């Protein structure tokens, strides 16, 4: 067991921390530099005595991998790699960067805790309506003629994207189960810092033969909430670009929120206070976690303010 000095496994709280894309950058080089700072904030939480599970986005990374393999395939210098495999590859190299940076930062502080990354599969329902209405553009841009040719051969859906060309679109189904849940829970209980469910997890469906990867994008915050509930975490922490959630955002009457309950969060969501592409999915994930874990709470804040947020000094807390 790897509990911190003065802590027991019974007194330590488990938190699931969802990193926003701003913590990772858009290229491997930028990511490696940014993650050094990210690691410091994460180790601050460990130093406070928390057991930490880290999830992260992978939008720019998986997109870059898909574009690269598409290009290689188009020019006859490499295979076209399926999207689920691109997701697995992104989990691998993001996990490697996080694992290495955190191991180094823990060593600098003389904290002896192993860090491990888990390639994670997330089960989705093959009958999820999202598969009938794919909306998430991924991969390379194509001409209209090439896109239509690919649609005829594959049955995939391509759409025109902002005048820049045609792109493949995939579904964004809801996560129902994380295949490696028990493994992640065991690692946490043994004292490991765990990086898991990157990019919302690799989407899989259940078939007669077992699990099978599918082309889809799962919202990372939804998966983080599911993971937090299933491993019985005490808190879900979603890190983003702002210190606090606000209503009337960017208006003269903007109001930062310190603590809101589930009903208030739902009311503000219904009023359209939260942008669908940014804050709304984070609020929804927090509501889902707190509804299923009434004794737990969720926190939304920035990476820089995470430690103070956990101490109740800043950030927005969502409670039952």
Feature names for model-found ranges:
Residues 1-11:
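Short, Lys/Arg-enriched N-terminal segments with co-localized hydrophobic residues
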């Amino acid at each position: 067991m790897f509990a911190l000095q003065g802590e027991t496994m019974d007194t330590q709280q488990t938190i699931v921390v969802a990193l926003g894309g701003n913590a990772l950058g858009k290229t491997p080089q930028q990511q490696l530099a940014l993650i050094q700072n990210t690691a410091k904030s994460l180790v601050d939480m460990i130093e406070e005595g928390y057991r930490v599970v880290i999830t992260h986005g992978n939008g720019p990374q998986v997109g870059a991998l898909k574009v690269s393999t598409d290009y290689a395939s188009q020019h006859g210098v490499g295979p076209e790699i399926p999207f689920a495999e691109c997701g697995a590859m992104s989990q691998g190299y993001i996990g490697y960067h996080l694992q290495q940076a955190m191991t180094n930062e823990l060593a600098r502080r003389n904290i002896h805790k192993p860090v491990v990354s888990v390639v994670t599969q997330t089960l989705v329902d093959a009958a999820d309506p999202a598969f009938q209405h794919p909306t998430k553009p991924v991969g390379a841009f194509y001409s209209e003629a090439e896109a239509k040719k690919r649609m005829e051969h594959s049955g995939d859906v391509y759409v025109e994207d902002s005048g820049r060309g045609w792109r493949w679109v995939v579904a964004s189904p809801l996560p129902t189960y994380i295949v490696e849940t028990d493994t992640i829970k065991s690692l946490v209980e043994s004292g490991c810092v765990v990086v898991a469910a990157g990019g919302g997890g690799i989407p899989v469906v259940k078939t007669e033969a077992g699990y099978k990867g599918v082309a889809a994008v799962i919202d990372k915050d939804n998966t983080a909430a599911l993971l937090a509930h299933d491993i019985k975490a005490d808190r879900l922490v979603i890190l983003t670009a702002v210190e606090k959630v606000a209503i009337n955002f960017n208006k003269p009457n903007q109001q930062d929120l310190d603590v809101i309950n589930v009903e208030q969060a739902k009311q503000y969501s219904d009023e359209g206070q939260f942008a669908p592409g940014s804050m709304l999915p984070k609020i929804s994930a927090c509501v889902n976690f707190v509804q299923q874990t009434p004794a737990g709470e969720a926190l939304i804040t920035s990476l820089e303010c995470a430690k103070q947020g956990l101490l109740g000094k800043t950030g927005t807390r969502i409670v039952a």
